[in-house]
Swiss-Prot record:
Residues engaged in binding Cu cation: H103, H105, H182
Location relative to the cell: Cell membrane
Keyword match Nucleus: no
GO CC terms in record: plasma membrane
Name of the protein described by the UniProt record: Superoxide dismutase [Cu-Zn]
InterPro entries: SOD-like_Cu/Zn_dom_sf (IPR036423), SOD_Cu/Zn_/chaperone (IPR024134), SOD_Cu/Zn_BS (IPR018152), SOD_Cu_Zn_dom (IPR001424)
Originating organism: Mycolicibacterium paratuberculosis (strain ATCC BAA-968 / K-10)
Gene name linked to the record: sodC
Top-level taxon: Bacteria
Keyword set, alphabetical order: Antioxidant, Cell membrane, Copper, Disulfide bond, Lipoprotein, Membrane, Metal-binding, Oxidoreductase, Palmitate, Signal, Zinc
């Protein structure tokens, strides 16, 4: 009668056999050992394009001449605590070559042959009122005073300028606002008192120069926020 091996010996053989068996390698072939999961999934969105950053809030306004001819577009982009204002002419020959004053005015109206809120004789776009002042701001330069637009000989021009004098909410609040291009250059009331006197003998700029920059007639207007 054959002798039976003790249980301990059998267990040792099983362990030995397991230790001597060839290792199994992960494979992607059908019917073979599946890949071993390590517990670390592939990076989320690997291979996919990264999401584009959110666009800055903006307003685009179309400026027109008194006869309705579109003259320029103005885009206001708000980010990092300031506004970037881009003005581009859209019709050559409407604006004369040279510098043109550009201001934001305090009433969102662009009416040809209209009367100013303070009264007086009618004129183009006068119902837009004077230069815009942001809430809590007084004095010159006004909040709505922007860099002048320089027009080339062919009547076209582009201006990119920045300002932290107002927010988007300021421009769209209350009666809204309008952006106006003037016929002439803005002197920004730079009339040195030590060199120039008013007609009445008072040195420095007068009230008209302080409030308008002597930029002349209003030749193009667009209500901000009206498209």
């Amino acid at each position: 009668m054959p002798k039976l091996l003790p249980p301990v010996v059998l267990a040792g053989c099983v362990v030995a056999l397991g230790a001597c068996s060839s290792p199994q390698h992960a494979s992607s072939l059908p019917g073979t050992t599946p890949a071993v999961w390590t517990g670390s999934p592939s990076p989320s969105g690997a291979g996919a394009a990264e999401a584009a950053p959110a666009a800055a809030p903006s307003i685009t306004t179309h400026l027109k001449a008194p006869d309705g001819t579109q003259v320029a577009t103005a885009k206001f982009e708000f980010s990092n605590g300031y506004a970037t204002v881009t003005i581009e002419t859209t019709a050559n020959g409407v604006l004369t070559p040279g510098f043109h004053g550009v201001h934001i005015h305090k009433v969102g109206k662009c009416e040809p042959s209209s009367v100013a809120p303070t009264g007086g004789a009618p004129g183009d776009f006068l119902s837009a009122g004077g230069h815009f002042q942001a809430p809590g701001h007084t004095g010159e330069p006004a909040s709505g005073d922007l860099t002048s637009l320089q027009v080339r000989k062919d009547g076209s021009g582009t201006l990119v300028t920045t300002t932290d004098a107002f927010t988007m909410e300021d421009l769209l609040g209350g009666r809204k606002t309008a952006i106006i291009i003037h016929a002439g250059a803005d002197n920004f009331a730079n009339i040195p008192a030590e060199r120039y006197n008013q007609t009445n003998g008072t040195p420095g700029p007068d009230e008209m120069t302080m409030s308008t920059g002597d930029a002349g007639k209003r030749v193009a207007c667009g209500v901000i926020g009206a498209g």
